[in-house]
Amino acid sequence: MSSAAVVHHDDLMEPTLQSIINQKTLRWIFVGGKGGVGKTTTSCSLAIQLAKARKSVLLISTDPAHNLSDAFGQKFGKEARLVDGYSNLSAMEIDPNGSIQDLLASGEAQGEDPMAGLGMGNMMQDLAFSIPGVDEAMSFAEVLKQVKSLSYEVIVFDTAPTGHTLRFLQFPTVLEKALAKLSQLSSQFGPMLNSILGARGGLPGGQNIDELLQKMESLRETISEVNTQFKNPDMTTFVCVCIAEFLSLYETERMIQELTSYSIDTHAIVVNQLLFPKKGSECEQCNARRKMQQKYLEQIEELYEDFNVVRMPLLVEEVRGKEKLEKFSEMLVHPYVPPQ
């Protein structure tokens, strides 16, 4: 299990995310976990705390469910937009499954292409992009390119539920495979197809194969460069979010092992929805659930003794809107003290 390069030994047991706020070299922070454990609430709250310490913060949702708009009560889209009430916190929601057509189309309807009826463009597209994950990889690379040009000091990713979270790590390989396939097609059939399809080409946006190759190569370079940063613990860390239940703990352990195998730093776990029944409480369900949660909390502390483990309470209301998010975010840096 990895630990951050600049986190000092004295801070390792601190039950907060303060070490992440203090680590000024961080540029990329990923927040991930199983569905329904409070990832979006945690990533929004972390971004709010970072905005107090950094010049500019960008919060990006790559979860197709797009909960950022719901959390802040404000509509976000593909373009970065300032969050109401903040001068240095922006947010955007992107679809990681965006299609190749969206990326390459220049706004011309396919029906206007005289060759569209022959299906030549579609055939080339199907051949070139038959490798699984190419759409997603190119969409992600486009986002990274956009994010890099915007030059935010720190970027927080509210990721899709585990299973999709770590896909971006395989994208350079996926793009390399697609490039190799396209190069092969280009050398074998390129001149012939380009002449058949005419100057406008048969690919979306009227591009020919060489232009498409150049575009994919530039995207591959971007994604490879950023992936190098992802593996640098001074620049990137991953915050795991879970609840104190078996399946969530199992998923967290699997995710941490996968992150470690990719050399991605992780040293913080946020445990959400913890019950703190008052002493002498006669709520049978509350006490039974607390007992179960206590068992898994002990396992978390034993398994991840060199992690910052943050304990967050189950609240009586949904955490939605600026005020509630700010209140919740305070508990990420100041440990929650349950009422006696």
Curated annotation (Swiss-Prot):
Binding site for ATP: K34, G35, G36, V37, G38, K39, T40, T41, E245, N272
Localization terms from the record: Cytoplasm; Endoplasmic reticulum
GO biological process: cellular response to oxidative stress; pheromone-dependent signal transduction involved in conjugation with cellular fusion; post-translational protein targeting to endoplasmic reticulum membrane; response to heat; response to metal ion; retrograde vesicle-mediated transport, Golgi to endoplasmic reticulum; tail-anchored membrane protein insertion into ER membrane
Gene3D superfamilies referenced in this protein's UniProt entry, alphabetically: P-loop containing nucleotide triphosphate hydrolases
NCBIfam families in the record: GET3_arsA_TRC40
Protein's job: ATPase required for the post-translational delivery of tail-anchored (TA) proteins to the endoplasmic reticulum. Recognizes and selectively binds the transmembrane domain of TA proteins in the cytosol. This complex then targets to the endoplasmic reticulum by membrane-bound receptors, where the tail-anchored protein is released for insertion. This process is regulated by ATP binding and hydrolysis. ATP binding drives the homodimer towards the closed dimer state, facilitating recognition of newly synthesized TA membrane proteins. ATP hydrolysis is required for insertion.
Name of the featured protein: ATPase get3
Organism listed in the record: Aspergillus clavatus (strain ATCC 1007 / CBS 513.65 / DSM 816 / NCTC 3887 / NRRL 1 / QM 1276 / 107)
Gene designation per UniProt: get3
